[in-house]
Amino acid sequence: DMGCGTSILAILARMRGAKPCTAIDIDEWCVRNSIENIELNGVTDIAVSQGDASALQGKGPFDVVIANINRNILLNDMKQYVACMHPGSELFMSGFYIDDIPAIRREAEKHGLTFVHHQEKNRWAAVKFVL
């Protein structure tokens, strides 16, 4: 869960059977809040780290990567997401506008990702790719 914020996505993934899970955020408050939320929800096997996408180095491979961050960070960090994935891994990204999908898609395809689909709500977009 990149840009985990409160770690709600990592917590949900863990509750649905994913394990182990990793949650990373650049903000110290988010890391502290994530740890608290994980404890409040009674889940285990979620490792929380403070940092940017470089914190992924040496981790994985992951079956699923979730990133809910702005467009520019997603474009910049996508190479690092792919580096911790394996063939068949899924990448879900959100936090950008529907108009940004072509740029996100071009960058993803440069890194060997295949576009699966997108969803839109109030001009906000979420996309799914597979490696």
What are these regions (language model features)?
Residues 64-66:
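Hydrophobic beta-strand segment of the Class I
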